[in-house]
Regions:
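Long, contiguous binding/interaction regions
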Residues: 1-64, 68-127
């Protein structure tokens, strides 16, 4: 079919293709990235929930995260993660990590080594 001297196919080909916009990543995604790096990328994120938090002077969110470490190497990385988390200096733009605590740890050895870790992180808006 011709439209003003061009076929319909030619008309479709001449349309400008715009690149996809990057999805905006929020503090929760940046926190998961930081936790994954601290876990040496051996952790599987099972659950992540976020609750708004506020005081008279600060606002932010409390994050609850569950991670699994499967296999001997992953469990070793998990043990290091548990030891380092409370004192770790996070660098998340626009956020201050006020608290990072391990709330539970569960080890199993059979049928394969596995470690389940629950953490809570309080992030405050840095504005």
């Amino acid at each position: 079919m011709r439209i003003e001297g061009r076929t319909q196919f030619e008309d479709q080909q001449s349309q400008t293709v715009r690149p996809l916009r990057k999805l905006r990543r929020g503090p929760a995604e940046h926190l998961r990235d930081a936790l994954a790096a601290l876990a040496q990328h051996h952790a599987t994120f099972v659950r992540h929930s976020e609750r708004a938090w506020a005081s008279i002077t600060f606002t932010g969110a409390r994050h609850s995260v569950e991670l699994f470490f499967d296999g001997a190497d992953a469990v070793a990385a998990g043990e290091e993660f548990v030891a380092c988390l409370p004192d770790h200096e996070f660098t998340i733009r626009g956020q201050i990590v006020a608290e990072a605590n391990v709330t539970s740890v569960d080890h199993t050895l059979l049928p394969a080594p596995r470690m389940e870790v629950s953490v809570e992180v309080l992030m405050l808006d840095d504005k």
